[in-house]
Amino acid sequence: MSPIGPRSFSGCSCCMPRRRFLGTVAAGIAGFAASQAAAQVPAPSPPSPSPGLVIDCHGHYTTEPQALFAWRKRQIASLNDPAQAPRPDDLKISDDELRQSVEGAQLKLQRERGTSLTIFSPRASGMGHHIGNAATSEAWSRVSNDLIHRLTTLYPSNFVGVCQLPQSPGVAPANCRAELERCVKELGFIGCNLNPDPSGGHWRDPPLTDRSWYPIYEKMVELDVPGMIHVSASDNPNFHATGAHYINGDTTAFMQFITSDLFRDFPTLRLIIPHGGGAVPYHWGRYRGLAQDMKRPPLTQLLRNVYFDTCVYHQPGIDLLTRVVPADNILFASEMVGAVRGVDPETGQSFDDTKRYIDGASLPEEARRKIFAENALRVFPRLAAALSARNAPSGTPR
């Protein structure tokens, strides 16, 4: 995502009838629910979504109303005088403002590009964990997550929530357990974003495999929710946020996993590395060789717990990803409206219209179905239940 700041996005505010979408989702998750009831096992087999179901596992709220930026600006200005800090309930944003913020952007693009729904979280670069202290992050995360919840309530057919965690440099991630539990149990969220570097590009905290992270992993396993490894804004001028810091975070996380026994300790923990896995697929041979030289298990063992998304913005990149990484480990994603918003002059299409690349890849239909929907339903076990609970019409129709 681009650094936090107001964005405008114009477009049509009308919506298509909700009935068609709900029918698609209901058909898509029917096999999933049936398999759970019949098998009664904690790790269900992948569901069998109906043709056309497309789940975008990586979307951020990047078209926020101006009032949210004003609240955050007040919060940052009060860091030296906490008595002046705004309270969460000082933020006043109407439902109409929320609708206006997404109807001409995310919802319009969902309709145009054929995406069924988006797993939605606060702006990644806006998490700003390097700003202030743990109390700052706690208040900011709560405000940000509550807005996502309101959007998922207004548009239950379009958005399902994933939470921002109140991480802070030098603070053990155990402090994030309460917000994660609140978001999952009270707000109906189905996952979280984990920042491997809350310092914003200075990498001062322990790696993701350090035992200081174990309390949050224990809570994730208890709640049966996955995490997406996602850095926030860069506070280091050496690293452009979306062009360097993001890809560095993705690649660094994968190498940390190779050199650790994290998944021996948490065999059911599921972690998603976004942006196509950073540099990992391109250097797959390097990582296989390093694992071998270090007497670590083969990468196929790591893939029991690690997944990659498709936020890769050209056809050759997606072709490489799908040739190197098994289809079972790839989740469809676009990150729209996100890091790259322009039109590719070579194709005449938007860079972030990633569904076109999956459609254009040389894949068997079974693999395409897995990437578009089946894998998301498997990696996010709470997704099917969340969608089933939302079949009753409410809010503004799609």
Model-derived regions: residue spans:
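Aromatic-lined glycan-binding groove of carbohydrate-active enzymes
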Residues: 261, 267-301
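Catalytic metal-binding/acid-base residues of hydrolase active sites
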Residues: 60, 197-199, 232-233, 277, ...
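Mid-to-C-terminal alpha-helical segments outside catalytic/metal-binding sites
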Residues: 2-36, 41-53, 57, 66-117, ...
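Glycine-enriched alpha-helix->loop->beta-strand junction motifs that scaffold or abut catalytic
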Residues: 187-190, 223-225, 268, 303, ...
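Active-site gating/metal-coordination segments in enzymes
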Residues: 116-253
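Short aromatic-enriched loop/helix-cap "lid" or pocket-rim segments at secondary-structure transitions
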Residues: 65-70, 132, 204-206, 239-242, ...
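Hydrophobic faces of well-ordered beta-strands that scaffold small-molecule active sites
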Residues: 55-59, 118-120, 161-163, 192-194, ...
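Proline-centered flexible-loop/turn and helix-kink motifs
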Residues: 156-157, 188, 215, 264-268, ...
